[in-house]
């Protein structure tokens, strides 16, 4: 939304449909950055929708005709076919990419982009390295793990400045910060042990004794007013409101120093070496798609999102967009001046130091192989044209 030693990144395998929580309320990219099951969502000249092996349908995209006059397009006017794999079912958290399809931004850059929608069970890194996709929606800890495993992929942009991971508490707890949640029973998934739990232990002295297994069932949290539960900013708070009838206290870990980037763009190192212009065009067009989605009319992207994921609701989409804006998930930090997608050496080092300090990665690992800054940090004005 998505890292663990067994590559089940950022959470457990599947979310059970308990307490009648509809999948739309839990549709998120959370913790699943390598567990993706691809349907055939082709976008650009058309959209083929498929979800977890369900029958496909085709919808013609309303993007404009290829524009050879665009300075970013190829001289012949031909579009370069590109496939981008997401890490979860279609949702607002992927909106900028869908917007770039729906409004023709990718075409303006000479690209015919196919988005392959994610879901559980399929390994995105394998698809990337095997050539089934050209770019992948990744996550920082997985990128560093790839260096450790000598997998030659690289992160070229980060659409989310803040990871949307949150902890939720009952209003009766009167907690004011993450520090107030120390020693409370905390429901977390197994993959938290290699992502945000080491951070909480290092900074707030959380202990393993307070951990409780989280299986995407909010019932234990709802039943215990002293309990804490992990969540995704744009999903669980809304689900708790609807199922529990109250507004949970929400603590965004990123606002307390948990600083990995999220919703990244990854590709093979060989693509960066052999065709940097292609990488730059895809990154630039995706960034413009995010500006359009957040600052303009998101309806074109939302239509594609709902077409691909029929269980996604307007309520969930609107809630997600509001939270992304309210908390500065996409635009905050260096992105405020350097543009969406921005990354810095300092942020990567900070996250690596925290994780290596807790023994997740060896301190000698050359983590800088996990990313490059050459395609981002152009400045906000660079994306206004």
Question: Which residues make up each language-model segment?
Answer:
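N-terminal secretory signal peptides
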Residues: 1-50
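Short linear loop/turn motifs
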Residues: 114, 122-123, 254-255, 318-325, ...
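Bacterial lipoprotein signal-peptidase II cleavage site
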Residues: 52-61
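Secondary-structure end/capping motifs
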Residues: 275-360
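Short, glycine-/small- and polar/acidic-enriched structural segments
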Residues: 42, 62-214, 218-223, 227-234, ...
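Conserved C-terminal helix/tail region of periplasmic/extracytoplasmic solute-binding proteins
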Residues: 345-385
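Short helix-capping segments at alpha-helix termini
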Residues: 105-108, 204-206, 243-245, 311-314, ...
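Pocket-lining segment of extracytoplasmic ligand-binding domains
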Residues: 141, 216-220, 224-313
């Amino acid at each position: 939304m998505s890292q663990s030693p067994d590559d089940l990144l950022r959470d457990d395998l599947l979310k059970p449909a308990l307490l009648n929580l509809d999948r739309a309320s839990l549709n998120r990219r959370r913790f699943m950055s390598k567990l993706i099951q691809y349907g055939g969502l082709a976008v650009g000249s058309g959209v083929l929708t498929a979800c977890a092996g369900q029958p496909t349908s085709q919808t013609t995209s309303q993007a404009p005709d290829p524009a050879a006059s665009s300075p970013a397009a190829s001289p012949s006017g031909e579009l370069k076919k590109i496939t981008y794999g997401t890490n979860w079912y279609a949702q607002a958290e992927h909106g900028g990419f869908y917007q770039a399809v729906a409004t023709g931004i990718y075409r303006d850059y000479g690209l015919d982009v196919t988005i392959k929608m994610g879901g559980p069970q399929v390994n995105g890194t394998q698809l990337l390295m095997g050539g089934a996709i050209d770019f992948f929606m990744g996550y920082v800890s997985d990128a560093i793990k790839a260096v450790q495993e000598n997998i030659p992929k690289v992160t070229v942009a980060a659409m989310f400045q803040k990871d949307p991971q949150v902890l939720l508490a009952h209003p009766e707890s009167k907690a004011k910060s993450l520090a107030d949640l120390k020693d409370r029973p905390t429901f977390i998934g197994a993959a938290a042990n290699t992502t945000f739990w080491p951070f909480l232990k290092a900074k707030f002295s959380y202990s393993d004794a307070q951990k409780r297994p989280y299986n995407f069932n909010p019932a234990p949290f709802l039943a215990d007013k002293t309990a804490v539960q992990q969540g995704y900013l744009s999903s669980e708070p809304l689900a708790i409101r609807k199922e529990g009838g109250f507004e949970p206290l929400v603590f965004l870990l990123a606002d307390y120093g948990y600083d990995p980037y999220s919703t990244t763009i990854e590709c093979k190192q060989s693509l960066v070496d052999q065709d940097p212009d292609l990488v730059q065009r895809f990154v630039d067009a995706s960034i413009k798609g995010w500006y359009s989605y957040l600052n303009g009319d998101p309806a074109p992207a939302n239509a594609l999102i709902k077409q691909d994921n029929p269980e996604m609701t307007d309520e969930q989409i609107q809630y997600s967009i509001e939270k992304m804006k309210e908390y500065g998930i996409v635009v905050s930090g260096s992105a405020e001046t350097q543009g969406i997608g921005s990354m810095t050496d300092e942020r990567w080092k900070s996250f690596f130091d925290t994780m290596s300090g807790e023994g997740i990665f060896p301190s000698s690992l050359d983590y800088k192989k996990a990313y490059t800054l050459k395609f981002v940090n152009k400045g906000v004005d660079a994306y206004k044209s």
